[in-house]
């Protein structure tokens, strides 16, 4: 069970969900190259009668599900990577920029969210240094972050190597039986994977995004001009990672953007992404035409100092691509894309994001902020899928990827959007070819436009498919997509839906450890171990509540049936009866074989004895 509690006495401190998931405990595995690292995983125990070991699963929930760790939202999480970062000797602390009124949308008085109580001096690269995981990987250095993610990806499967199965179609991905730190280094060095890990976010537990690793999911949170608060957004972040979000994007667009982000980053054990353009727009009063490179640059530095791990940069929206969207059914649906398109048309020139991209790289290089190159011209309806505007921008994203790589910056590429099923694979194939196998990060895609209120399902279908084809991270869609700002329950539904999609993709790709949890749950289902079924599921609370709606008594959790079929029509119970009967017949047949030969085995068919003796003969 989880509880929601404020971790200090201050009434302004947000209450967050804590406590372990059912039958689960946090375990840690230590490093070999870097013995100081402790990699978290979740161990799910099963009933002793099963005679099976616990199941180990990936766990991005941080200390919030570990009852042995005391957390304080006002203090933030432990800075576990700080010593790793400073030990490399290539960073320096400095005072950083001062927070200005425009950083929080000019909010004052009661409308101003309190500053995060603890302020550490930000770090940046020393002059001439690149402090990115890509730079280290290219230099042949295996960082603690690289060993951390290698251990994390394996999920203890080195203990299961004899039982693992490679069953799937990987479409060119090269998933190893065992992930080594050197394999991680090589994937990062070649740009096929990224480890989003800003040097000013030492609280984060390293994770990796790449098609040769587990498929990851992102959850979006953030306030708007009309709804939500700091307390709600911090709880949404904690709630999202509790259910399996690997990264979280803060897409706040209202007031208090700076202070809300500080509270989120300081308490986030996962990478945090943003769209800096949103805050830059707030700084100029929401007027796109008034945006400047200077305002945007200041916003990048502000967020890099806070510890944002990856930026969505809509630098691929070029002036001559905008006319390609005129005949679309839904035009330009990306907020960032529409802002930059409006700016370009007003000023009759290329965007400042495109013109100053090399300078953006210099900033990201100094803090190890990864690029998430935005798809500002993504299709917003299936009618617009795979059109000239979408693929023209993708070509530019490929060009920008090479520029970023030349600056030692980590890069992933954002993708659509709304794409019918038969057009999905073309998106993956083109992205791999154009962007040099940089990780693909897609929103869905939604496979049909007819289901407002159910777009977590329409997009989950596309997400599972494109994840199978090679997408490295899937951005979740909630039931509120196109309708409103998601609340806490919407966040959970979106995360669970996308955990299903990501896991289905891992299974289809033939990930060597993907089936372990499935098989454990299937055995529990066949053996009517109801509690194990609940606990091994992605959402134990919902599974248990659905079962208990019709069979609420504890005795029902020992029953060999559920309310769907009842005791007489349960297929698995009937299968048990068939298996028992077959076993009985087999024993009777064996007895017949031995009867004629005594201790010396003589096949019954050779002795003339009947294979199935009558019942009175066995009495």
UniProtKB/Swiss-Prot annotation:
Substrate binds at residues 220, 249, 278, 314, 334-336, 375-378, 414, 441. Binds 1 [4Fe-4S] cluster per subunit. The cluster is coordinated with 3 cysteines and an exchangeable S-adenosyl-L-methionine. Pathway: Cofactor biosynthesis; thiamine diphosphate biosynthesis. GO terms for biological process: thiamine biosynthetic process; thiamine diphosphate biosynthetic process. InterPro entries: ThiC (IPR037509), ThiC-associated_dom (IPR025747), ThiC/Bza_core_dom (IPR038521), ThiC/BzaA/B (IPR002817). HAMAP family: ThiC (MF_00089). Residues 1-11 have a biased composition (Polar residues). One of its GO terms (cellular component) is cytosol. Residues 1-25 are annotated as: Disordered. This is Phosphomethylpyrimidine synthase. Its cofactor is [4Fe-4S] cluster. It comes from the Bacteria. Its EC number is 4.1.99.17. Keywords: 4Fe-4S, Iron, Iron-sulfur, Lyase, Metal-binding, S-adenosyl-L-methionine, Thiamine biosynthesis, Zinc. Homodimer. It catalyses: 5-amino-1-(5-phospho-beta-D-ribosyl)imidazole + S-adenosyl-L-methionine = 4-amino-2-methyl-5-(phosphooxymethyl)pyrimidine + CO + 5'-deoxyadenosine + formate + L-methionine + 3 H(+). GO terms for molecular function: 4 iron, 4 sulfur cluster binding; carbon-carbon lyase activity; zinc ion binding. Catalyzes the synthesis of the hydroxymethylpyrimidine phosphate (HMP-P) moiety of thiamine from aminoimidazole ribotide (AIR) in a radical S-adenosyl-L-methionine (SAM)-dependent reaction. Zn(2+) binds at residues 418, 482. The keyword Chloroplast does not apply. [4Fe-4S] cluster binds at residues 562, 565, 570. The lineage of its organism: Bacteria, Pseudomonadati, Pseudomonadota, Alphaproteobacteria, Hyphomicrobiales.
């Amino acid at each position: 069970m989880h509880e929601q509690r404020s971790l200090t006495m201050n009434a302004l401190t947000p209450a967050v969900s804590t406590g372990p998931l059912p039958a689960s405990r946090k375990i840690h595995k230590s490093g070999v190259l870097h013995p100081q690292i402790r990699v978290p995983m979740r161990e799910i125990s099963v009933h002793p009668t099963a005679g099976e070991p616990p199941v180990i699963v990936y766990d991005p929930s941080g200390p919030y599900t570990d009852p042995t760790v005391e957390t304080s939202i006002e203090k933030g999480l432990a800075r576990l990577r700080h010593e790793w970062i400073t030990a490399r000797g290539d960073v320096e602390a400095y005072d950083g920029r001062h927070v200005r009124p425009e950083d929080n949308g000019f909010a004052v008085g009661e409308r101003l969210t309190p500053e995060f109580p603890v302020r550490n001096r930000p770090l940046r690269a020393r002059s001439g240094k690149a402090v990115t995981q890509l730079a280290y990987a290219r230099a042949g250095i295996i960082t603690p972050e690289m060993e951390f993610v290698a251990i994390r990806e394996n999920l203890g499967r080195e203990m299961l190597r004899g039982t693992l199965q490679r069953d799937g179609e990987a479409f060119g991905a090269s998933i190893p039986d065992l992930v080594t730190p050197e394999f991680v280094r090589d994937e990062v060095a070649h740009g096929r994977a990224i480890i989003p890990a800003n040097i000013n976010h030492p609280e984060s537990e390293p994770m990796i995004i790449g098609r040769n690793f587990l498929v990851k999911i992102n959850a979006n949170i953030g306030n708007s001009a009309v709804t939500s608060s700091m307390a709600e957004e911090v709880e949404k972040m904690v709630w999202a990672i509790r259910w399996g979000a690997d990264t979280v994007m803060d897409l706040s667009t209202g007031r208090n953007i700076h202070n809300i982000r500080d509270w989120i980053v300081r308490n986030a054990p996962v990478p945090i992404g943003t769209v800096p353009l949103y805050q830059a727009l707030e700084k100029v009063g929401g007027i796109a035409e008034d945006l400047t490179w200077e305002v945007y640059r200041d916003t990048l530095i502000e967020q890099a100092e806070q510890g944002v791990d990856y930026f969505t940069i809509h630098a691929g929206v070029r002036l001559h691509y905008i006319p390609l969207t005129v005949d679309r059914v839904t035009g330009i649906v990306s907020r960032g894309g529409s802002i930059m398109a409006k700016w370009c048309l007003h000023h009759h020139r290329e965007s400042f994001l495109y013109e100053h991209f090399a300078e953006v790289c210099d900033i990201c290089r100094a803090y190890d902020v990864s690029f998430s190159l935005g798809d500002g011209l993504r299709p917003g309806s299936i009618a617009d899928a795979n059109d000239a505007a979408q693929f023209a921008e993708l070509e530019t994203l490929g060009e920008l990827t090479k520029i970023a790589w030349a600056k030692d910056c980590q890069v992933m590429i954002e993708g659509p959007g709304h794409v019918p099923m038969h057009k999905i694979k073309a998106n993956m194939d083109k992205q791999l070819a154009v962007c040099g196998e940089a990780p693909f990060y897609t929103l869905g895609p939604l496979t049909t436009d007819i289901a407002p209120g159910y777009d977590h399902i329409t997009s989950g279908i596309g997400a599972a498919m494109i994840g199978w084809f090679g997408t490295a991270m899937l951005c979740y869609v909630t039931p509120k997509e196109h309708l409103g700002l998601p609340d806490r329950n919407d966040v959970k539904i979106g995360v669970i839906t996308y955990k299903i999609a990501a896991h289905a993709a891992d299974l289809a790709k033939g990930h060597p450890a993907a089936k372990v949890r499935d098989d454990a749950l299937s055995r529990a289902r066949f053996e009517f171990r109801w509690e194990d079924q609940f606990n091994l599921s992605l959402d134990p609370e919902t599974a248990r509540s659905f079962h208990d709606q019709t069979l609420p008594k504890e005795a029902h959790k020992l029953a060999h049936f559920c309310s769907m079929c009842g005791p007489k029509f349960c297929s698995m119970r009937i299968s048990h009866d068939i298996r028992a009967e077959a076993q009985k017949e087999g024993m009777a047949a064996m007895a017949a074989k031995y009867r004629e030969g005594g201790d010396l085995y003589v096949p019954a068919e050779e002795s003339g004895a009947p294979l199935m003796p009558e019942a009175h003969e066995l009495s």
